[in-house]
Amino acid sequence: MLGSKANGIKLYVLSRFKSKMLMIIIFVFLASGCSSYKFLSFKKKQSKLSTEKIFSVADFSNTAKDDLYQLCLSLGRETLEDMVRLLACTNALLAKDALSHQQQKFAITEYNLSLNEIISPLLNNKQHTPHNFGNLSISFDTDLQGDIYLLSDLLMHDQELQFSVFGELGVAGVFARKNTAQGNDAYYPLEGVYRPINFSLSELRKVGSKWQLKIANEILLQQKSKIMGKNKYSLNYSPASAYLVLVEQADIDQLSWTGMINPGEADARRGIFAIEELNDNKTPILMTHGLNSDPLIWLKLTLALLNDRELHDTFQIWHAYYPSGSPPFYNAMMIRKRLKNILSKHPGLNKKSKGVFIGHSMGGIVNKTMVTSSGYQLWDATYTLKPDELLQQSSDYEMEKIFVFEPVFEKNISFFVDTPHKGSNIASSLVGYLGSALITLPDKFLDLNRSFINRIGADKLTLRMLPYMQNFGPNSVQTMRPGHPLVEVLDELPIHGKVYSVIGSQSILSCQSEQQCLEVNDGVVDYISAHNQQAEEEIVVSSSHDSYKNEKSISFILAKLREATLE
């Protein structure tokens, strides 16, 4: 009997354990949108070209256009030297006046192909000194210390993720170097700095008995052209490919879970990271993720922006990462601080005083603090006395910044994606309580609250806020429960600038009545909470709390951004 009872207890405990783990797994699944981001690989192509002992090439400058075209057509493609001759021939042809469409298309295509065949094996060897082939020496204009990936060497595993190439001439690639953490590198991803690069023919000349081929290798941050004779050709470059190679190397997605359950461990990675070079002439777009998430959720949207030449030339993309277990208002204060730091160090970035904010789920709550004027409403919802009656120490003013803030920019465009403006019912469910129990708040946050409350006294907390301040502060899940005072107050604050909403649904995609709208729910946030009265326009898309990757929502965001470029 005792054995049976013991076995029964074991089975009961095991069942309870499995149920709890199942709830945790469900919570994690519902609250996040993370997935594997390994979608490309790199092929290392070895040259199949043979080499000659003696290289020589004719002077094509005085050859008539049509004769030169026929000569280029007749050249071989078997050896490295053949490819150099073809490159020199097409280079001369591209400088001729009045090329036919067929001649120009041929010349550009063969120029690019021959150059790619020449440099691909050289880059694979990662040698920065001249490469010697008999009496032919090949070198690059700039000795770039880092890794280079040619676009022809990128093997895409996910056909939905593609990159556009802007331009027509030269070989496009990606240059990658380590992040030095110095200067502007402090605002770039820690995984490294990834930039588009273009290769083109610099010069081919004979020095004594030797031939020297020099190849221009230029990092392109915007469209540039190459003058050849009286003709101008735009150089190939691909901002989206640089981002894809960065994402393939990124490890920030490994901090989604850690950032939620133990935010202190992930705090070192907190920041705002510019995907491209900081640019005073481009409007920043800040993309902010939600609970148990990371910046890689913005993969498809970021690619769409980088693949659109007009939008790429108008906007610069910044990704925010924050450990999501800490409450959103604390995280918002930290992100505002980082944002203002960037703008203070680079005042030119703020010359238009215009910003775009795109937030998913709780990230929308974080972003909302960037575009609202709080006055003392959030403070009054928390404390019974005004700041000037409570603030005494320098650390107290850090506390004030959590509750009192102004819009960062004068002009704003806000996109709220699956955002629980009134909280999420799942945060109040058993799943939410289990998720909340997993979170260990960081000492930095707890110490800030503890020292302040111990000094002013818990009696200075409002009755509504008091339950949330047990153990010196709520975590993010507790803050997102419907009825939280700060979320309610923030929901009523006017948003400065234009507002758009993207709402997810696992069922119907539109609603005309209150009863119908109750059916719109993405599994985490319902329509009532996701709907924002201040939105100029909202759309409902098929989504399980992952509208950030929905094609309809991406098209909607891009369309609104294009409208903004016309203003």
Regions picked out by a protein language model, each given a short descriptive name:
Residues 299-315:
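Short amphipathic alpha-helix adjacent to the substrate-entry channel of hydrolases
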Residues 22-30:
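Hydrophobic helical h-region of N-terminal Sec-dependent signal peptides
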